[in-house]
Amino acid sequence: MAKKCMVNREIKRIKTVKKFAAKREELKEIIRKVATYSDEERAAAQEKLQKLPRNASPSRVQRRCRITGRPHAVYRKFGLSRIKLRELTMRGEVPGVRKASW
């Protein structure tokens, strides 16, 4: 089990990403459009983007297992780590999933 503080930190990061998502996208759009905006406007937008909190970047968020909080080997489709996914599948608690046999 991951520490509660680590799980809470990830939740806080997710909230921060959602809070600044529109502003980040707006600034990135200004930076991308070379023909529309002047160099000064683009430089100002880049500076504003750099001043946003680091945790506002989506790449800082790490997927964690919903049950254990484990950060590695988490399946996106289920939101579970490989260990918990196997346990729940073997007990038949994950609908539509069963052990392969051929």
From Swiss-Prot:
Full protein name: Small ribosomal subunit protein uS14
One of the record's GO molecular function terms: structural constituent of ribosome
Designated gene of the protein: rpsN
Family affiliation: Belongs to the universal ribosomal protein uS14 family.
Keywords: Ribonucleoprotein, Ribosomal protein, RNA-binding, rRNA-binding
Gene Ontology BP annotations: translation
Organism per entry: Dichelobacter nodosus (strain VCS1703A)
PANTHER family per UniProt: 30S RIBOSOMAL PROTEIN S14, SMALL RIBOSOMAL SUBUNIT PROTEIN US14M
Entry-linked InterPro entries: Ribosomal_uS14, Ribosomal_uS14_bac/plastid, Ribosomal_uS14_CS
Function in brief: Binds 16S rRNA, required for the assembly of 30S particles and may also be responsible for determining the conformation of the 16S rRNA at the A site.
A GO cellular component entry from the record: small ribosomal subunit
Gene3D superfamilies: 1.10.287.1480
UniProt key word RNA-binding: yes
Coiled coil residues, start to end: none
TM region(s), chain numbering: none
Origin superkingdom: Bacteria
Subunit: Part of the 30S ribosomal subunit. Contacts proteins S3 and S10.
Pfam family, one: Ribosomal_S14
